[in-house]
Amino acid sequence: MIDSLDLVIDTIVAREVLDSRGNPTVEAEVLLEAGAIGRAIVPSGASTGAHEAHELRDGDSRYLGKGVTKAVNHIEDRIAPALCGISSLDQASVDGTMQELDGSDNKSSLGANAILAVSMATARAAANGLGLPLYRYLGGPMASLLPVPLMNVINGGAHAANNLDFQEFMLVPHGASSFRESLRMGAEVFHTLKGLLSAQGLSTAVGDEGGFAPNLANNDAAGDLLIQAIEKAGYSPGKDISLALDVASTEFYQDGCYAFGGGRYTSTEMVNELEKLVDRYPIISIEDGLAEDDWQGWALLTKKLGKRIQLIGDDIFVTSTKRLQQGIDQNVANSILIKVNQIGSLTETLQAIDLAGRSGYTSVISHRSGETEDTTIADLAVATRAGQIKTGSLSRSERVAKYNQLLRIEDELGSQAVYAGATGQGPRGRS
């Protein structure tokens, strides 16, 4: 029998490690009294919302200013003394203690990267101390829903050095009967797409998230290529595999207009452009179709398309219950993107997912463009029964690590495993 004292935090250490872009990030290890260890590494974004929690960087000559030794030192000098002696099972107390110690509204004192690393490592240590997988520890005995992956196979915008305005063009294999099958379907289309690009003399180099980053004539050309790849791989667009977009429109929002494709569009015109895309392609989900503070534009987008497709708020919500509640009150979007480092603690992440579910919004668990081998978000997707995950393409090990963890979870669950696409709990195709 496990003694509760065995699960008390004994030691916390931190170090500066590298993410998938070669930039420093924070790793934390939490050691419990009985010897269980939890380790976590935080990710970092490229296109970041203005309202995200503060990522603390050193700003000196090391790593061109991107070092994180300040955050590492905060963990070992300030956070560790405050948390040692607290039960790892009391996640809310652990996270609350760090927030109180920080004292700011956006975690700018200690750094959200410092707080989150310890928060996630604590949960991992508690799970290990109890002998449970992380998804079971966080989600309880009913955690058995495997998410539909939104696979970013063509990268643009801030994620690639090409001429595509929109940031992500994704495959959504909702027609699969299992997560394993969805992964196979996505991989087959991914490799078929590579062949199509090569045949046209286009680049098959990949961007930050493992998708291809070719120079194409326009955003429509990307959609056309994906339809061709889906069909050539033997699948039916809209039935087996649909499309999703991350427009990341904040990135090209200038002086009240959306500047892309050689034109400038008002919010109303931008909504009309997105509606045309939904009419033309089997798109079932659009993320950040409008900019992070264009609340009126978002309301119009939701009124026009909210009953037809999933409208995900990323930059506008930043995994914040306060901003999500504002969106709920104003009928903005119908889904929230969940990025643990946007809000900076596991407790607040779970609160955002809970609020979304109670309000009829879907949640999409997401990686960042600067990722690591950490697989926490895979377990989080299953634990929270979110039904959807965004973790990149079918290449680059930091992306595939999450897919492989979901395969392990599906195997471990056996007959209990349920694929969200097979039950209609993920995004679904349009007839």
Swiss-Prot record:
Cofactor(s) annotated in UniProt: Mg(2+)
Alphabetical UniProt keywords: Cytoplasm, Glycolysis, Lyase, Magnesium, Metal-binding, Secreted
UniProt-annotated binding residues for (2R)-2-phosphoglycerate: 167, 339, 368-369, 390
Subcellular location as annotated: Cytoplasm; Secreted; Cell surface
GO cellular component, one term: extracellular region
Catalytic activity field: (2R)-2-phosphoglycerate = phosphoenolpyruvate + H2O
Active site: 209 (proton donor), 339 (proton acceptor)
Signal sequence segment: none
Its biological purpose: Catalyzes the reversible conversion of 2-phosphoglycerate (2-PG) into phosphoenolpyruvate (PEP). It is essential for the degradation of carbohydrates via glycolysis.
Protein name: Enolase
Species per Swiss-Prot/TrEMBL record: Prochlorococcus marinus (strain MIT 9313)
Lineage: Bacteria, Bacillati, Cyanobacteriota, Cyanophyceae, Synechococcales
